[in-house]
């Protein structure tokens, strides 16, 4: 079975580091570096990402409009009904 909790297996060549929660900041440089970096990265890739989304939106709206038109009845087919 397993070993007791105080006598666990030693793991060699594993180094861990820790920092006290009192010595670290929650959001360092969040507004000064984070938001400008997001804007820079967005501007860098917008021309690769936006065209497929725009094309999909146009095809989707066209398809939805065509579907709604195809559900309507043709009034000319019912002119002579009484």
Swiss-Prot record:
Cleaved signal peptide residues: none
Subcellular compartments: Mitochondrion inner membrane
Family classification: Belongs to the UQCRQ/QCR8 family.
Function: Component of the ubiquinol-cytochrome c oxidoreductase, a multisubunit transmembrane complex that is part of the mitochondrial electron transport chain which drives oxidative phosphorylation.
Domain of life: Eukaryota
Parts of the chain that traverse the membrane: 40-68
Primary localization: mitochondrion
Residues with the N6-succinyllysine modification: 33
Gene field: UQCRQ
InterPro entries from the UniProt entry: Cyt_bc1_su8, Cyt_bc1_su8_sf
A Pfam family it matches: UcrQ
Ranges of the Mitochondrial matrix topological domain: 2-39
Protein source organism: Bos taurus (Bovine)
Membrane-topology descriptor: Single-pass membrane protein
N6-acetyllysine: modified positions: 33
Gene Ontology terms: cellular component: mitochondrial inner membrane; respiratory chain complex III
Protein name, per record: Cytochrome b-c1 complex subunit 8
Membrane side Mitochondrial intermembrane: residue ranges: 69-82
Alphabetic keyword roster: Acetylation, Electron transport, Membrane, Mitochondrion, Mitochondrion inner membrane, Respiratory chain, Transmembrane, Transmembrane helix, Transport
GO biological process, one term: pyramidal neuron development
Subunit structure and binding partners: Component of the ubiquinol-cytochrome c oxidoreductase (cytochrome b-c1 complex, complex III, CIII), a multisubunit enzyme composed of 11 subunits. The complex is composed of 3 respiratory subunits cytochrome b, cytochrome c1 and Rieske protein UQCRFS1, 2 core protein subunits UQCRC1/QCR1 and UQCRC2/QCR2, and 6 low-molecular weight protein subunits UQCRH/QCR6, UQCRB/QCR7, UQCRQ/QCR8, UQCR10/QCR9, UQCR11/QCR10 and subunit 9, the cleavage product of Rieske protein UQCRFS1.
């Amino acid at each position: 079975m397993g070993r007791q909790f105080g006598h666990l297996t030693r793991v060699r060549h594993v180094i861990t580091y820790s920092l006290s929660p009192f010595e670290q900041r929650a959001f360092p440089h969040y507004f000064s570096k984070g938001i400008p970096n997001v804007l820079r990265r967005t501007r860098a890739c917008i021309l690769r990402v936006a065209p497929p989304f725009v094309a999909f939106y146009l095809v989707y709206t066209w398809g939805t409009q065509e579907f709604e038109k195809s559900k309507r009845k043709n009034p000319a087919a019912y002119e002579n009904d009484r």
